[in-house]
A protein has these predicted regions:
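Long, positively charged amphipathic alpha-helical accessory segments at protein N-termini or as interdomain linkers
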Residues: 1-11, 15, 110-138, 148-291
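N-terminal lobe of the biotin/lipoate ligase/transferase fold
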Residues: 1-132
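Short loop/turn and capping residues at structural boundaries
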Residues: 22-23, 141, 181
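Short, basic and Ser/Thr-rich N-terminal targeting/leader segments
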Residues: 45, 70-72, 142, 151, ...
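Short loop/edge segments at beta-strand edges and connector loops
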Residues: 53, 140-142
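Conserved active-site carboxylates
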Residues: 145
Length: 291
């Protein structure tokens, strides 16, 4: 990459991601596992794919484009996110060309009240792909995480844009492929990566496998709603049957997780009876842990 190709407006220098200026060309000390656009297009022929080297956030970029045109069937990927976002305003850390930062646009014909389980459906799509890749100990965590043996490997952030009677879902997915120890320490919670779990596929191959599985899950959700996913979610849910605490702002409710409902809501058996919680600004933790 020539230095003049470096994106303007980013509070980031090439050296931050390991690039060095050698004779007027920005280079890496070791060749990174870059995403291959042609292979992505061949593996995902129904999608319009854009691979960006450095971007603020793939979700932010797609939201900007959604203001002017449809983003259905579009897939944005970034080698590096300078401002990746997670749920509840958190930052998603993503070193250059070592993890996956991607956003999928999907048209949803169901009305907004029926989309409560959407993040769970996406999580199950990712989890299914990981199991097919041979990863053991795959779990999901309500409402939007995928885990390996209790440690987070994938995060999901979904934003919705109204389109007539339906909407378009802007589905952001971050997947840890290869994490260094210092990066794990920065995350602030138990984190897993795919390489440590025995996955040898390239980032391009992983992207194709993950997105194919997510698209298949979305198609099933569009046709049948969330009811088809309840049993498998309960089976894979990290906290199913356990004593947990649900936090909503200053409110904290404890009880046993008994499952999820037909709109993806969490069902908690409490001392005062059954309570149901929807996603958004809600945190779920084991009863003896802190958020």
């Amino acid at each position: 990459m020539p230095p003049e190709a470096w994106p303007e407006g980013l509070d980031l220098q090439p050296e931050t991601i390991g690039l060095h200026n050698e004779g007027g060309v920005l280079r890496f000390a070791q060749p990174p596992d870059l995403l291959r656009s042609q292979a992505l297009e061949a593996g995902l022929p129904t999608l319009q794919i854009e691979v960006m080297h450095v971007v603020d956030s793939t979700n932010t970029r797609m939201m900007q484009h959604a203001a002017d045109a449809s983003v259905a069937q579009k897939l944005y990927l970034a080698e590096f996110q300078a401002g990746g976002r997670g749920r509840r305003g958190r930052t998603w850390l993503s070193p250059y060309a070592r993890n996956l930062s991607m956003t999928l646009g999907a048209a949803m014909s169901r009305p907004l009240p029926q989309l409560g389980g959407l993040s769970l459906v996406v999580g199950l799509g990712l989890a299914s792909a990981l199991e097919d890749l041979g990863v053991e100990g795959v779990q999901v965590k309500w409402p939007n995480d995928v885990l390996i043996n209790g440690a987070k490997v994938c995060g999901i952030l979904i934003e919705l844009v109204q389109r007539g009677d339906g909407c378009e879902a802007i589905i952001g997915m971050g997947v840890n492929v290869r994490l260094a120890e210092q990066e794990r320490a920065q995350i602030g919670q138990p984190a897993a990566d795919l390489v440590s779990s025995g996955v040898t596929e390239s980032r391009t191959e992983l992207t194709v496998a993950l997105i194919r599985s997510v698209v298949a899950s979305l198609e099933l959700f569009e046709a049948h709603g969330f009811s088809r996913f309840i049993d498998i979610f309960n089976h894979l849910h990290r906290f199913h049957g356990e004593k947990c605490a649900v936090t909503m702002g200053a409110q904290r409710v404890t009880g046993e997780v008994v499952g999820v409902g037909e709109q993806g809501e969490l069902i908690l058996a409490t001392a005062s009876g059954e309570q149901r919680f929807h996603g958004g600004e809600v945190s779920l933790r084991a009863e003896d842990s802190s958020d």
